[in-house]
């Protein structure tokens, strides 16, 4: 059975802004990556670059958005960093990230993040553990980013 990453994080912003932090290049570059090239539509690119001078490594080059509904959810393919590239980036299908947004209070949004597609061997277990930490830290970073400047 697959070991899905499931994370939940409440952040201090409205639903619209939370969604934009996953779909707008300038906002993605404020918390998740150095360079973003995202086209927020089904089959649009979802390419993030942590080293823009070496786009083939430590990036999601070639990844696509698989589903999107404004202020509700976004799903996209995902690749691994250089240490996992030899198996993650050639897997068919690639791993897959789904992010749902909900809000029951003004200026408070809950993000539900699921990362699926993990295979069952030790390399994949290491990659899965890496990404569980990475996504958790990224969501904490997003909350800290919002705390710095509550009005964007």
Where is each model-derived feature located?
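Hydrophobic ligand-binding cavity/cleft-lining segments
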Residues: 1-37
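Short, highly charged C-terminal tails/helix-capping segments
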Residues: 144-152
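Hydrophobic-ligand binding "helix-grip"
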Residues: 36-37, 58-106
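Beta-strand/loop substructures that line and gate deep hydrophobic ligand-binding cavities in soluble
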Residues: 85-133
């Amino acid at each position: 059975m697959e070991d899905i990453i499931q994370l939940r994080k409440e952040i201090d912003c409205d639903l619209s802004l939370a969604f934009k932090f996953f779909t707008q290049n300038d906002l993605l570059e404020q918390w998740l990556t150095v360079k973003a090239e995202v086209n927020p539509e089904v089959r649009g690119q979802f390419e993030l670059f942590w080293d823009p001078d070496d786009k083939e490594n430590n990036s999601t080059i070639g990844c696509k958005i698989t589903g999107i509904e404004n202020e509700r959810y976004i799903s996209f393919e995902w690749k691994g960093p250089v240490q996992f590239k030899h198996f993650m980036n050639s897997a068919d299908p690639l791993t897959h990230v789904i992010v749902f947004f909900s809000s029951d209070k003004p200026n408070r949004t809950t993000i539900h993040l699921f990362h699926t597609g993990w295979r069952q061997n030790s390399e994949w277990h290491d990659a899965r553990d890496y990404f569980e930490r990475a996504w958790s830290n990224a969501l904490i970073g997003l909350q800290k980013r919002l705390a710095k400047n509550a009005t964007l």
